[in-house]
Each structure stands twice: as structure tokens, then as C-alpha cells.
Amino acid sequence: MNGEYDYEDGAQHQDGARESAVAGASNTNQISTSFFPPPPQVYKKFTKRNLRYLEILNSHKLADDEPSWDLLSVTQRLERQNAILRQPGSSSKIDAEQLQDEEADMAAIQDQDCDKPMTDLPDFDLKAELEPPNVDWIEEDGGYTVFGQLWPIPDVTPTLQQLGIPVLYPLEGTDRKELLLTLLRTLLQTYREITGDLLKPAQPYDVWVPAVPDPNLTPEQQQQQMATNPGFWTQTTEAKDRLKHMQNVVVNMQFLINELRPVQAKETLKLIMQMQLERRKQEMQLIQERCATMRARVEELKKMLGKQSDCYGSS
């Protein structure tokens, strides 16, 4: 390393290095949204040898005229990495025998890595792939992605308007418990109406839609049009509308219940403290009863000993 570096070029490549450090292997691996997704393929790079190489890179001290890793492009980072790992000295040497013994336990995971000769160096950026992502960058991006879903920072619960769901209750100045009871009655009423619709005979076309005459035609032409095409029958959408209304009611109820979570936590804590107080009162009462029993027993023993001493004295 000669220490010469173009800082303007490094500033241009900083964003590229940052994106590669944050994304890691997710750019090359397809995102899995299954309930039990497989682990990311980047775990195969966490071998004993690569971790040793990473320790060497982290322990290496840069010169005063050398730029930091964040200012380098991807190519420049790899060049510096290989140059540091090829440096002679005890700090950059890896004992081959010790390494083979340590990697024997991971043979099932890293067969390909063990087959490589010890002189081969990794062809990827060790610091970008193996080090944890920079939290500051994640906060600047405003969120992070987990299994294909974006989670914002800070975690904000979206409102019903943002989710595209109609709000069926006033937003302010109303008791949430009363609103839940009202929504529950609405849900039961809509369910009863849907049940009544299902009990009716099947009518695939039960709504008559009259035709609308063309206003550009003369009255005689409009009458002729209405005579040839008076309208058509179609299916009713009442059942679908009621089902959609039930879904909206349930979502509104869930949203209200989530708003009551702090109140529920406070009431639960109050109940737990009351239960602890009652349990301690019961324990104290039990201790007092046991103490009273022991006192009575001691008094009985004293009386028995007194009687025995009187008997021995009289004899």
C-alpha cells in the first residue's frame, strides 16, 4: 500500500460500498416469504478461516495517509484486504495444522472451503459480509427488510385511513368500550342478515337494471331503443357488501382493541399487585394462626410440666 488515494473518487464510491455492506448477500439470494424460510446463504461464509481473516483485518492499523474503509470502492476494498492478508508477519499468519483441526468440526458446512489451499484468499469483502450492518445506515434509510416486508424505524402502527379501511367510529371523545359493544352488535346484526340471505332460494339473477336512453337521440328513437333493449337482470351484491362490511367491522374492532392494550396492561398489573397483596395477607394470617397454635401448645406444655413438678414435690 503506497498511501496514494483519490478522495473524490472514494466519495463517489462510498454509497456503493455502503449498499453492499447493508444488503450483504440479499442481493444475490432470492427473498423467501414462507413461514419457515431457509437461512440465508451468507452463513456459509462464516467459516473459521474467514473469521480469522476478519480478525486480522480488524487488528490492522491504517496509516495516517490511508483512507478509512468506508471511503473505498468495492474494488479498492478487495485490493486492500488482499494486501493486508498477504503481509508477512506473525499477525497475518494462520497455523495450517491448527486451522485444519478447528475446521474439522465444520466439514459438513464448508466442504468447498476446506478443499481450497491455504494460500487462497476470499474473493468477497470480508468486512462487508461478516460484520454486522451499521445501525446508523439503517436508521437513515428509515427501516429494514425482513423476509420481504419493510419494517419502519421507529415502529409506527398504520392508521385505518392509511390501510384503506373505512373508520366506523368517531376518532375522539368516545368511550372505547361502548364503541366495541356497538361494533359487536353491528357484527351480529350483519351476520344475521347474511344467514337470512343464505336461507333464501338461489336466485342467480334477481336485480332488474333498467336501460338508460341515449340523450342524443330523438324521443321516437329513444322509445324504439327502450322497446328493443329495456334493461337486463343481474346478480345482487348485498351478500358481498354485507360480508365486506363484516370484515371492516372486525378490523375496526381489532384496531380499537389494540388501542386499549396500554389500559389492559395497567389493569393487568393492578390485578397482579392485588393478587400478590391478598396472597401476602393470607400468608400473614396463616403465620399468625400457626403462632397462636404454637403459643397454645407451649402453654399446655407449661401446665403439664407444672403438674408433674407438683406431683414430684408432694411425693
UniProtKB/Swiss-Prot annotation:
It is found in: Nucleus. One of its GO terms (biological process) is regulation of transcription by RNA polymerase II. The keyword Transcription regulation applies. Residues 1-36 are annotated as: Disordered. It comes from the Eukaryota. Coiled coil: none annotated. One of its GO terms (molecular function) is transcription coregulator activity. One of its GO terms (cellular component) is core mediator complex. The keyword Secreted does not apply. Component of the Mediator complex. Component of the Mediator complex, a coactivator involved in the regulated transcription of nearly all RNA polymerase II-dependent genes. Mediator functions as a bridge to convey information from gene-specific regulatory proteins to the basal RNA polymerase II transcription machinery. Mediator is recruited to promoters by direct interactions with regulatory proteins and serves as a scaffold for the assembly of a functional preinitiation complex with RNA polymerase II and the general transcription factors. PANTHER family: MEDIATOR OF RNA POLYMERASE II TRANSCRIPTION SUBUNIT 7. This is Mediator of RNA polymerase II transcription subunit 7.
